[in-house]
Every structure is written in C-alpha cells, then in structure tokens.
Curated annotation (Swiss-Prot):
Listed Pfam families: Nuc_deoxyrib_tr
Function: Catalyzes the cleavage of the glycosidic bond of 2'-deoxyribonucleosides and the transfer of the deoxyribosyl moiety to an acceptor purine or pyrimidine base.
Gene: ntd
GO molecular function, one term: nucleoside deoxyribosyltransferase activity
Name under which the protein is recorded: Nucleoside deoxyribosyltransferase
SUPFAM superfamilies: N-(deoxy)ribosyltransferase-like (SSF52309)
Enzyme class: transferase
Functional pH dependence: Optimum pH is 6.0.
Catalytic center residues: 98 (nucleophile)
Pathway(s) it belongs to: Nucleotide metabolism; nucleotide salvage pathway
Oligomer status and interactors: Homohexamer.
Keywords tagged on the record: Nucleotide metabolism, Transferase
C-alpha cells in the first residue's frame, strides 16, 4: 500500500496541546497510509537539534529562529499533506500560519481535533483553509491515499 508523508503541525506549549500531540503521533504510528519516518515533525527538526522546549533561551536567537522557520517551510513544501492538530480553545498562531502556507503550496490540509473538543467553534481562517476536519479517534483509520473534502460539523468564529 502506498504511503504519504505529512507535515505534522501541532502546538506543544500547554498540557492540553502536549496530550493532543502525543495522541496524534500514536494514531499516526498505527495508520498504514502514513510514512511517518520520512514525514516532517517540526519539534524533531529544530536547527542544530536545539529544542526550545528544553532550551527556551534560543527563542531569542535570530540564527536559530531563522533556520528553524525556513526548515519548517521546507517541511511543508516537501511533504504530501499538511496535518494540523487543533484545539479550539487553545489556538496556536504558528499552526495558523503553517495551515495558510500549506494552502498556498497546494497541499491537502487536514485538521485533527481531540474528540472532546470536536464540534466546538473554530477560527474562520483555520476552517477556511482546511479540506477536512476529523476527530482524533478517526486519525488512525484515515486513508491519506484518498483525501477528500468534507465540512466541519461545528461553527466558526
């Protein structure tokens, strides 16, 4: 079975974001249509391997920031699909930028929302750039070889 690569967009700044991040990664490991090994996960590809969750002082380093930003853009351009882990009550502005950039590059954009948050209102712009919005529990079985458009069942704000 063919496999697709993804750009894994997800916040990791709060406990809820970290929980959703881990749940999504576990689901992707089980998904037979994803080539996770060759996909781009920003937290695993920060410049010179310096993770700002462990070394926040690098958030003030222009070389680190510029290189990490450009690597992330390359990750979006060179992977098949943009996947965004989205928490309606904790929107991450960086994810919003990544979603818009992916759309500009002609990428299929999939938002994944934790089941307990699915149906809550989401940002109009995040909704607008998304080709589909699914529950976290659907991620392990989502067929990335046959991406389709569908409407989000919740409202927008």
């Amino acid at each position: 079975m063919p496999k697709k690569t993804i750009y894994f967009g997800a916040g990791w700044f709060t406990d809820r974001q970290n929980k959703a991040y881990k749940e999504a990664m576990e689901a992707l490991k089980e998904n037979p249509t994803i080539d996770l090994e060759n996909s781009y996960v920003p937290l695993d590809n920060q410049y010179k391997g310096i993770r700002v969750d462990e070394h926040p002082e690098y958030l003030h380093d222009k070389v680190w920031a510029t290189a990490t930003y450009n690597n992330d853009l390359n990750g979006i351009k060179t992977n098949d699909i943009m996947l965004g882990v989205y928490i309606p009550d904790e929107e991450d502005v960086g994810l919003g930028m990544e979603l818009g950039y992916a759309l500009s590059q002609g990428k299929y954009v999939l938002l994944v929302i934790p089941d307990e948050d699915y149906g809550k209102p989401i940002n109009l712009m995040s909704w607008g750039v998304s080709d589909n919005v699914i529950k976290m529990s659907q991620l392990k079985d989502f067929n990335f070889n046959k991406p389709r458009f569908d409407f989000y069942e919740g409202a927008v704000y």
